[in-house]
């Protein structure tokens, strides 16, 4: 993600918003 809090796997895997 872009705004990933924990994992930023491009498209957000865990916490993103």
Curated annotation (Swiss-Prot):
The molecular function terms of the Gene Ontology recorded here are:
sodium channel regulator activity; toxin activity
Q: In which tissues is it expressed?
A: Expressed by the venom gland.
Q: Which domain of life is it from?
A: Eukaryota
Q: Where in the cell is it found?
A: Secreted
| One Gene Ontology cellular component | extracellular region
- What are the UniProt keywords, alphabetically? Disulfide bond, Ion channel impairing toxin, Neurotoxin, Secreted, Toxin, Voltage-gated sodium channel impairing toxin
Q: Which residues form the LCN-type CS-alpha/beta domain?
A: 2-17
Q: Does the keyword Secreted apply?
A: yes
Q: What does this protein do?
A: Alpha toxins bind voltage-independently at site-3 of sodium channels (Nav) and inhibit the inactivation of the activated channels, thereby blocking neuronal transmission. The fraction to which this protein belongs exhibits low toxicity and induces transient paralysis in all insects tested (the crickets A.domesticus).
State the family it belongs to: Belongs to the long (4 C-C) scorpion toxin superfamily. Sodium channel inhibitor family. Alpha subfamily.
Its UniProt domain note says:
Has the structural arrangement of an alpha-helix connected to antiparallel beta-sheets by disulfide bonds (CS-alpha/beta).
Q: What is the name of this protein?
A: Toxin Bl-2
Which source organism?
A: Buthacus leptochelys (Egyptian fat-tailed scorpion)
């Amino acid at each position: 993600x872009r705004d990933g809090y924990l994992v930023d796997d491009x498209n957000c895997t865990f916490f993103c918003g």
